[in-house]
C-alpha cells in the first residue's frame, strides 16, 4: 500500500495532477467498488483543495492596487473593499 500525501499539504498543481489521475482511474471503470469509493472520496477532497487554492489566488490578485497609469503599487487588505 502506498502512502498518500495529505491533500491539505498539496500545492494546487500537485492536487490537480492527482485529481486528473483519480478521474482517469474512475472513468476506466476497472477499479473494485471499495477502491472506487475511496478514489471518489479522495477526488472530492482534491477538488475542494484546488477550489480553495484558486479562491485564495483570486483574492490575492484582487488585492493588488494600481496607480493612475495602471501600474501595480502594492496591495490592499482583503477586507478594505
UniProtKB/Swiss-Prot annotation:
It comes from the Bacteria. Heterooligomer composed of large and small subunits. InterPro entries: Exonuc_VII_S (IPR003761), Exonuc_VII_ssu_sf (IPR037004). It is an enzyme of class 3 (hydrolase). GO terms for molecular function: exodeoxyribonuclease VII activity. One of its GO terms (cellular component) is cytosol. The keyword Oxidoreductase does not apply. Disulfide bonds: none annotated. Its main location: cytoplasm. GO terms for biological process: DNA catabolic process. Keywords: Cytoplasm, Exonuclease, Hydrolase, Nuclease. It holds the Pfam family Exonuc_VII_S. This is Exodeoxyribonuclease 7 small subunit. It is found in: Cytoplasm. The lineage of its organism: Bacteria, Pseudomonadati, Pseudomonadota, Alphaproteobacteria, Rhodobacterales.
